[in-house]
Amino acid sequence: MNRRAFSTLGAPGADLDEVVRLARTGRCQGVELRCAVGQLVYPDMPATEAGRLGAALRRAGLAVPVLASYVQVAADDSGVVERLARHIDLAARLGAAQVRVFGGGADRADGRREQAVRHLARAAPLAEAAGVGLALETHDTFLTGAEVAAVLEAVGSPHAGAVWDAVNPWRAGESPERTAALLGPWLRHVQLKDVASPTDLRPVPPGHGVLPLPSVLAQLGRLGYGGWISLEWERAWYPDAPPLADALPAFHRVLDAG
């Protein structure tokens, strides 16, 4: 059985006690920590504070499969590798296994993939030294498994992998079968969610929307994927959505049925 987590994107502003309570009452063994200003974890978090938080989560019996950064690896920016290094160090202090990154680079007319490859290739040795992975999400300018796999194949490092956001490749027209086949060699983490429609991305409880979640789970089974599956409940972006605690039972029902 896959280990289950939730993203703190679903509980914006939650403190440590609230995160631990949500995990315990919500039957989750791990927490995907969103790294953003004003949140429990933030990019300039002091090393000692990060270490204390990581230790507190471990005492609570919780793992941190992913530190969800907002670093855009295809950005035309000389500071990308430095930001990656800072997030790698933060992840190591928290005990996080992966640093989630985005592609970005929407302002680049061309060379976006090459820029992402360069930045990830330069940061991969830093991740290796820290015992942390880098994981490029199917998101923004790299929505599909095809786009993410092309980057990771060119990087060619075991310390650079993929996060499969289950909605994005599907809404871009890529089937779960195709996404799984493309990302299989690099898959490090899966974000599960459901939406009202391909053009209405408001969160709905898993199994109550239009995403073919049984197909996603079937493909993960065919891959033999034994890693984490996290509920990404986007309440930070949709504040009218029900609380995360209300969505977790549906998340478990979908996984139990799969």
Regions found by a protein language model. Name each.
Residues 1-29, 54, 58-61, 95, ...:
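Histidine-acidic metal/acid-base catalytic patches
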Residues 10-12, 35-37, 70-73, 100-107, ...:
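Active-site-proximal loop/turn and secondary-structure-junction residues that shape catalytic pockets
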Residues 17-18, 56-63, 73-162, 169-171:
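Active-site acidic/histidine proton-transfer and metal-coordination neighborhood
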Residues 26, 30-37, 62-69:
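Short, conserved active-site loops that position catalytic residues or coordinate cofactors/metal ions
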Residues 32-54, 104-110, 201:
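Glycine-rich, proline-tolerant flexible connector loops at the mouths of alpha/beta enzymes
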Residues 33, 64-66, 136, 164, ...:
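Hydrophobic residues in well-ordered beta-strands that form the structural core
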Residues 42-50, 76-81, 110-113, 240-241:
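Metal-dependent catalytic neighborhoods of phosphoester/phosphodiester hydrolases
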